[in-house]
Swiss-Prot record:
Signal peptide: none annotated. It catalyses: (2R)-O-phospho-3-sulfolactate + H2O = (2R)-3-sulfolactate + phosphate. The lineage of its organism: Bacteria, Thermotogati, Deinococcota, Deinococci, Deinococcales. Its cofactor is Mg(2+). Belongs to the ComB family. Its EC number is 3.1.3.71. GO terms for molecular function: 2-phosphosulfolactate phosphatase activity; magnesium ion binding; sulfopyruvate decarboxylase activity. The keyword Magnesium applies. The keyword Magnesium applies. It holds the Pfam family 2-ph_phosp. Keywords: Hydrolase, Magnesium. It is an enzyme of class 3 (hydrolase). The gene is comB. This is Probable 2-phosphosulfolactate phosphatase.
Amino acid sequence: MRLRVDLLPDSHYPDVALVIDVLRATTTAVTLLEQGAAELLLTRTTEAALAVRETVPDVLLAGERGGLTIPGFDLGNSPVEVSGGAVAGRRVVMTTTNGTIAAHRAAQTARHVVLAALVNAHAVARHALAVASEEIAIVCAGTDGRVGLDDVYAAGVIAEYLLALGDFQVDDGARIALTMRRGGGDPGEALRSSGHGATLARLGLSSDVDYAAQLSTSRLIPTLVPGDDVPAGALRFLAG
């Protein structure tokens, strides 16, 4: 079995893709589904999210650009904001600067796509090992097209879990992520010291960074579930 870490999204995933945008999209996605959202519909663009609402009027819109809530949307991209339970039973359409785009990239070819974060790191590692047949790829979303320390650290945490569970052929990306994990301090330190962590702190969103640094507090696995009933331009993720 191969274990691969892409420091930025690639275009070919033959088997399992674990998509990470730890600050904050995939952490928020886990939280939305954990708080009872019926389903999560990820879109690449704001326009696509608004188009979904035209066809499915009862959805909630969640998303950010530049770290801030998109004007006219119901929610931002804050795991702290969505942890209050107001999303229970609702369909949520989500678009973010980096994470939802990475999910769409992975979904072009991967047989299994899962949203991964530190909060569900152990659960997604076990799930990936259970469903993979040839390769597990950990896909870092990055920040505005550049490698993000926060995602690489989180990838290293998941890679470390996987190596404790099975034998793998490890690529250089995985070695880089493991080195970052082992030398990066605890999760809070690593995320706060990242460029994106610092940006969120400047925006007054340090509580989101602290939330995202929690390790394996959730067993929820947001899993891509395609279907003819999924609105155009969206990917449907359900709680697994």
